[in-house]
Amino acid sequence: MSLLTYNFESEYLNNNHQITVILPDKKRGISPAEFYGSDKKYKVLWLLHGTYGDDTDWLRKTNIELYAAEKNLVVVCPSALNSNYSNWPSAMLGYNMYDYFTKELMPLVYGWLPVSDKREDNFIAGLSMGGRGTIKFAVNYPQLFAAAAVLSAVPVPFDELRPGHPCLIMDTANPRMVQTIENAGGFEAYANSEENVWALIDQLAPTEDLPRLMFACGHED
């Protein structure tokens, strides 16, 4: 496989941003002109890292390059800091990762790389924080993805986030969840936003719009 590292100034993140992309290699017996001049559009996996990670995690810590080669698949790995793949308009000059993903990153990849924008050719997956981002994008933009794999993560349990509810996820050991709710303008605003995955799943479940979903969690997760 070929490896592309691309660093660019993002309008939605208000800083330079880096992505890592795995691309199919030219097969032996095919001329460079034939391969690189082809109009072929490849299927793509949007692969999201977890907390404390970046765009290199999947490449350094897994065999994703081998799996991509087997499937002749493009893999796009963005870097999201510890943003929970949410918009943070009050952070620095604004760090709007949720909007960035669909409004900037995806158009960039479709426009500059040999990647199909058809729903049936687009897949999304992520680990831990990346899993939460995965399910959030999958249910808010079901028209964009054929399937989603949520690894070591589940949608946030909203009833347990209500003020006064005894919930481990709201413990002071997990300040990100508290900050995320404050960032949204409080619990009610948070519950009525794109973050409320449970409500969206309920709306989509009776329809044929929901992407195929896979959830997986290991014994040590």
Enumerate the language-model features and the residues they cover.
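Non-catalytic cap/lid and distal C-terminal segments of serine-dependent acyl enzymes
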Residues: 1-221
